[in-house]
Amino acid sequence: MVVIILARPRAGAKSETTKVRGIEVMIALDVSNSMRASSTDDPNGVSRLQRSKLILEKLINKLGDDKVGLIVFAGNAYTQLPITSDFMSAKMFLSSISTNMVPTQGTAIGAAVNMAMNSFSQNEKSGKAIILITDGENHEDDAVGAAKEAAKKGIQVNVIGMGTGKGSPIPMGGQGNFLKDDNGQVVITKLNEDMAIDIAKAAGGVYVAGNSTDAVNDIDENLKKLAKEDLERIVYTQHDEQFPVFAWIALVLMIVNVFVVERKNKWLSKYNFFTKTVKDDNK
């Protein structure tokens, strides 16, 4: 019985759909090998991917009643999390992202933007935005063209550029072990800032440098320009606690047990807890 009480049994779980006002945001995160490189000029600095995840977590925390989805891409693009109002799940999926998720290397930014466009709801009134976070290197398709298509649909594309113009080597495991080309030279991966800026301009978005302390606030301010519309959100109500019923049953059983034990215990019986003493007038 004690075990049951400690387990805190519950029943009657309910869910209900409520209306909130917000926008829809799809995040497209570059997971190509170049994102393992340092986000700064220091080869041993925080990787571009690690810094990207920190930035995106802060952005998700600012979304309020909005919805968010997550796409990862390298040579191909994949949906990691469909658009949702469950920010806890979004941050959980975000934390698990690595450069090993996409087998085909490359930076298919256009494919990621196109996938993001097709991931939004059919609600034409709600504001929609794509947050693209990449170093922009080795892009393989028409990323600017994809951004222009997004603009035609009223979708804002914001870009966060990771890395620096000077560039950094790509760690391959082990101290000082970096990726080398066919000639044995260390590969230096650089931020393609010009292309990142062109993508943002093509779709009414803003470009921010990932190393900027204002990166999160700049993106957040641009998102606030979008029209908020009624969005459905599923709210799970709290379960009804059932353990008090078992607690009362346990209490009654304990009291009954004490009385029974006292009556049967020879040592206790001499104290006459349950026997009324009758005075003998002849003594």
Label the model's feature ranges.
Residues M1-T17, K228-K283:
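C-terminal signal-anchor/stop-transfer transmembrane helix together with its immediate cytosolic
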Residues V2, D30-S32, S52, L70-F73, ...:
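DG-centered beta-turn motif at the end of beta-strands
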Residues R8-G127:
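Membrane-embedded segments
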Residues R36-S38, T79-L81, H139-D142, G167-I170, ...:
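Extracytoplasmic/secreted cell-surface and envelope-processing proteins
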Residues R51-K58, S89-M92, A108-A111, M115, ...:
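Extracytoplasmic/secreted proteins, especially bacterial periplasmic and envelope-associated proteins
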Residues D86-S89, Q175-F178, K225-K228:
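Short, hinge-like loop/turn segments at secondary-structure boundaries
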Residues P103-T107, A129, G136-A202:
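VWA/integrin I-like adhesion module and closely mimicked acidic/polar interface patches used
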Residues V206, G210-F243:
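Juxtamembrane amphipathic/hinge helix adjacent to a transmembrane helix
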